[in-house]
A protein has these predicted regions:
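A short, structure-level motif marking secondary-structure boundaries and short turns
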Residues: 1, 15, 49-50, 133-134, ...
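Short, surface-exposed helix-loop/turn micro-motifs enriched in polar/charged residues
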Residues: 18-22, 45, 198
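Conserved alpha/beta enzyme-core scaffolds, especially Rossmann-like or related mixed alpha/beta domains
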Residues: 20-23, 134, 163-166
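Thiamine diphosphate
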Residues: 84, 88-96, 114, 118-120, ...
Length: 219
């Protein structure tokens, strides 16, 4: 995670743009997912049985890109031109340009719906993979997230794991000053989710929570 942080900060400095705060706050969980949890292979990025990942808070691309590169999907040199004209790495990552990306991002509020779609598609095709969706507390002031949460519960999509970056900040300021979303744990529980609050910079807590979610799906 420390290496990815350095790459992210360097990319922001070079292109003089980006969303460093919301990117740096997710690098620990991205590191746990890619380097410990997810079944993904840079040599076979389109493996139909791979786990899926959706970066719903797509503006964290300057943090996601370094992880993708460090894991071997793309050469790290590509980050040297992050968000510059002609670069494959833009402010939002494009799955048609970056290997290892399951879906492109853009407008906030749609990632969990995409994750539900991945899970339902796998069920129809008889495939059993995990789907991880990383969202943020600021993003959760959009109602489409809660419609997607209701859908996941309705169809018992236990292989969908929602990871909320509860950093309490958004581009307009503090989340509570814009739209209060807490208590997030009680809200998700009301929709039928099993919820665990952890320290987002504690690798063990993150790993244990994700492993619990996987075990819950398998059981």
């Amino acid at each position: 995670a420390a290496k990815a942080r350095l790459l992210a900060v360097e990319a922001v400095h070079r292109c003089a743009s980006g969303h460093p705060g919301g990117s740096l706050s997710v690098l620990d969980v991205l590191t746990v997912l890619y380097f410990h949890t997810m079944r993904v292979d840079p040599q076979n990025p389109a493996d139909p049985d791979r786990d899926r990942f959706v970066l719903s808070k797509g503006h964290a691309a300057v943090g996601y890109g370094p992880v993708i590169c460090d894991y071997g999907f793309m050469p790290v040199e590509g980050l040297h031109n992050f968000n510059l004209t002609g670069s494959k790495f833009g402010m939002h990552l494009d799955k048609n340009k970056i290997k290892g990306i399951d879906c492109s991002s853009g407008s906030l509020g749609h990632g969990l719906s995409l994750a539900d779609g991945f899970a339902l598609a796998g069920r129809v095709k008889g495939q059993d993979y995990m789907v991880y969706c990383l969202t943020g507390d600021g993003e959760l002031n959009e109602g489409s997230n809660w419609e997607a949460a209701m859908t996941a519960a309705q169809f018992k999509l236990s292989n969908v794991v929602v990871l909320v970056d509860n950093n309490k900040c958004m581009i307009d300021g503090r989340v509570d000053d814009e739209m209060k979303v807490e208590p997030l744990d009680k809200k998700f529980e009301a929709f039928g989710f099993k919820v665990k609050r952890v320290d987002g910079q504690n690798m063990k807590e993150l790993n244990d929570a994700i492993e619990d979610a996987i075990a819950n799906h398998k059981n």
